[in-house]
Amino acid sequence: MTLIALGINHNTASLDVREKVAFSSTQIESALRAAIAGAGLSEVAILSTCNRTELYAYGSSQANSLIQWLAEYKQVNVAELEQSHYLYTASEAASHMMKVASGLDSLVLGEPQILGQMKSAYAVAREAGVLGGHLHDVFQRVFSVAKRVRSETAIGENPVSVAYAAVSLAQQIFSDLKQDTALLIGAGETIELVARHLAEQGIKKLIVANRTLGNARSLAEQFGAEAILLADIPEHLHRADIVISSTASQLPLLGKGAVEQALKRRRHKPMFMVDIAVPRDIEAQVGDLADVYLYTVDDLKEVIDENMRSRQQAAKIAEEIIVEGLLHYEREQRALTSVDTIKALRQTMDALREQELEKSRKALEAGADPAQVLEQLARSLTNKFLHTPSTQLKQAGADGEQDMLRTVRTLFSLPSANESKSEKE
């Protein structure tokens, strides 16, 4: 049984592959139970974002069986996963989780959202009843390390994120956003960040579209924006110079036909679109239209690279914190290996004690002198407790196993052999 981290991310897999194995928030709980039943795991958690899908597990499962389970569950070609996955076990898995939670493995170095997403993965697994003591301990150490990275380094400073990159790209297309209208589809954390960055750049008009009007209004009110339903997008799409979408929809929300109609009403004035969602919210064919500039999360990488240089030095410090955290984790894991031995020792000693106590009770019931019974009990306990260790130590001495002899002296705080000789002299 060991800790396992299996996944794909923006470095190992294309957007096409990532969206095939992405899990929506409503799918994760049932997937967790299916993984326990079908992949030979005793504990499991799933992290699924626009840039990665990862399984954190504790069990005896092999890489091939885990990949096979994921391929079958998501109904994808197993060869695609075999070519694009990564797998870590034991300490390497813990180290990877620490890097992910700290933002060191993100598309945007140091991006803060990933820690909240990992905490959500932990909470969902715990609620589903598939998170045991092993994964719980790992996650707590991971969260502790990530918190230190945030508080002790500047890795979270400077507004660099997918949301910021999307707005930066919009500024490159439209030099002055004060004359433009932006349609934001979704109402989650990423869209909220997009709205904040656009507002800071003085965007003329913001429209927020969501499946529920209440959620759209909740976000819109923060920025003086207009709120609409997803179903109303076709009526308002022509107003938007900028469209940025990030929802959890499993199907595209904007198709080529709807965008063509909007362009006609705009008299083919160009539209800038960024699809941050995985799976995609905007059909890929929309990018074929002459007056549309469509970008996906993969296209944002160049923009992000330009804005992350200031975090490189902080990342080096973060790596040192992670190494320190990993050492603590490994020490804790080594300590756990002694638990079974200590438990077995106590059980053995308890059994011997009960045997001798029973003999003493019977002697007292037969009228024996209590003082003699106590003396016999103490002598018997000493002999019983030390009989097997003494036999083993004699054999160790005969075999020249000095390490065992030194270990026993350390365990019982006995004087060294030289000290014992000095005392006799």
From Swiss-Prot:
One of its GO terms (biological process) is protoporphyrinogen IX biosynthetic process from glutamate. Pathway: Porphyrin-containing compound metabolism; protoporphyrin-IX biosynthesis; 5-aminolevulinate from L-glutamyl-tRNA(Glu): step 1/2. NADP(+) binds at residues 186-191. It comes from the Bacteria. It catalyses: (S)-4-amino-5-oxopentanoate + tRNA(Glu) + NADP(+) = L-glutamyl-tRNA(Glu) + NADPH + H(+). Keywords: NADP, Oxidoreductase, Porphyrin biosynthesis. InterPro entries: 4pyrrol_synth_GluRdtase (IPR000343), 4pyrrol_synth_GluRdtase_dimer (IPR015896), 4pyrrol_synth_GluRdtase_N (IPR015895), GluRdtase_CS (IPR018214), GluRdtase_dimer_dom_sf (IPR036453), GluRdtase_N_sf (IPR036343), NAD(P)-bd_dom_sf (IPR036291), Shikm_DH/Glu-tRNA_Rdtase (IPR006151). Its EC number is 1.2.1.70. Pfam families: GlutR_dimer, GlutR_N, Shikimate_DH. Possesses an unusual extended V-shaped dimeric structure with each monomer consisting of three distinct domains arranged along a curved 'spinal' alpha-helix. The N-terminal catalytic domain specifically recognizes the glutamate moiety of the substrate. The second domain is the NADPH-binding domain, and the third C-terminal domain is responsible for dimerization. During catalysis, the active site Cys acts as a nucleophile attacking the alpha-carbonyl group of tRNA-bound glutamate with the formation of a thioester intermediate between enzyme and glutamate, and the concomitant release of tRNA(Glu). The thioester intermediate is finally reduced by direct hydride transfer from NADPH, to form the product GSA. Belongs to the glutamyl-tRNA reductase family. HAMAP family: Glu_tRNA_reductase. Homodimer. Catalyzes the NADPH-dependent reduction of glutamyl-tRNA(Glu) to glutamate 1-semialdehyde (GSA). This is Glutamyl-tRNA reductase.
